[in-house]
């Protein structure tokens, strides 16, 4: 598990990416719920 990118740990990249993906999905669900994403 020592094979990292050198500067940023791989688990940190995975965690941040997961949070961004979940936030983006939640944002799209919120937009479609409030009617802002109904035109997409």
From Swiss-Prot:
It comes from the Eukaryota. SUPFAM superfamilies: Photosystem II reaction center protein J, PsbJ. Keywords: Chloroplast, Membrane, Photosynthesis, Photosystem II, Plastid, Reaction center, Thylakoid, Transmembrane, Transmembrane helix. GO terms for biological process: photosynthesis. Pfam families: PsbJ. The keyword Membrane applies. The chain crosses the membrane at residues 8-28. It is a single-pass membrane protein. One of its GO terms (cellular component) is chloroplast thylakoid membrane. It is found in: Plastid, Chloroplast thylakoid membrane. The keyword Thylakoid applies. InterPro entries: PSII_PsbJ, PSII_PsbJ_sf. Gene3D superfamilies: 6.10.250.2070. Disulfide bonds: none annotated. PSII is composed of 1 copy each of membrane proteins PsbA, PsbB, PsbC, PsbD, PsbE, PsbF, PsbH, PsbI, PsbJ, PsbK, PsbL, PsbM, PsbT, PsbX, PsbY, PsbZ, Psb30/Ycf12, at least 3 peripheral proteins of the oxygen-evolving complex and a large number of cofactors. It forms dimeric complexes. Belongs to the PsbJ family. One of the components of the core complex of photosystem II (PSII). PSII is a light-driven water:plastoquinone oxidoreductase that uses light energy to abstract electrons from H(2)O, generating O(2) and a proton gradient subsequently used for ATP formation. It consists of a core antenna complex that captures photons, and an electron transfer chain that converts photonic excitation into a charge separation. This is Photosystem II reaction center protein J. It comes from Zea mays.
